[in-house]
């Protein structure tokens, strides 16, 4: 689905930025008859429900014309929330030392899910060091399907 999200990113990023928000990332979940398109936005102040509604209406108008996804889907515009999703290398860099849960595109040594602390980010190799209970592991950022911060209470 990377192609769909890349196409949508190219289409909506200038619009969202023009409205004063940052496009954090996009999740597209193809789920039978009704797929879900999640757009995560942020700003230097908190995101309100009203902000999400304004962006959603603007994007709906664009999607009605451009039709980047065939078939029916639900559009969700959201703030990143407390368990913030991480989409890009810069996101991992911003949250060094934070707990994360990672889900990989394919198993690594028989494991698809990882939990630990972001120890470091390599700009050169496009990898992160994840420090967990069993020690440190180096993971390729391009192989991470989904990543979220994990909050300890």
From Swiss-Prot:
Domain of life: Bacteria
Protein name: Ribosome maturation factor RimP
Keyword S-adenosyl-L-methionine annotated: no
Source organism of the structure: Vesicomyosocius okutanii subsp. Calyptogena okutanii (strain HA)
Family the UniProt entry places it in: Belongs to the RimP family.
SUPFAM superfamilies for the chain: YhbC-like, C-terminal domain (SSF74942), YhbC-like, N-terminal domain (SSF75420)
One record GO biological process: ribosomal small subunit assembly
Keyword Electron transport recorded: no
Record function comment: Required for maturation of 30S ribosomal subunits.
Keywords: Cytoplasm, Ribosome biogenesis
Localisation: Cytoplasm
NCBIfam families: PRK00092.1-1 (NF000927)
PANTHER family in UniProt: RIBOSOME MATURATION FACTOR RIMP
Main location per the UniProt record: cytoplasm
Any single GO CC term annotated in Swiss-Prot or TrEMBL for this entry: cytosol
């Amino acid at each position: 689905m990377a192609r769909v999200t890349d196409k949508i990113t190219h289409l909506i990023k200038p619009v969202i930025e023009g409205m004063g928000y940052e496009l954090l990332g996009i999740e597209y979940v193809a789920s039978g008859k009704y797929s879900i398109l999640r757009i995560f936005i942020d700003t230097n102040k908190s995101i309100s429900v009203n902000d999400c509604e304004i962006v959603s209406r603007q994007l709906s108008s664009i999607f009605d014309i451009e039709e980047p996804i065939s078939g029916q889907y639900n559009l969700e515009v959201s703030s990143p929330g407390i368990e913030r999703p991480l989409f890009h290398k810069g996101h991992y860099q911003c949250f060094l030392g934070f707990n994360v849960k990672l889900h990989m595109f394919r198993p690594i040594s028989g494991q698809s899910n990882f939990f630990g602390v972001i120890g470091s980010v390599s700009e050169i190799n496009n990898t992160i060091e994840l420090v967990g209970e069993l020690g440190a592991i180096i993971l390729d950022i391009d192989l991470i399907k989904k990543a979220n911060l994990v909050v300890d209470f």
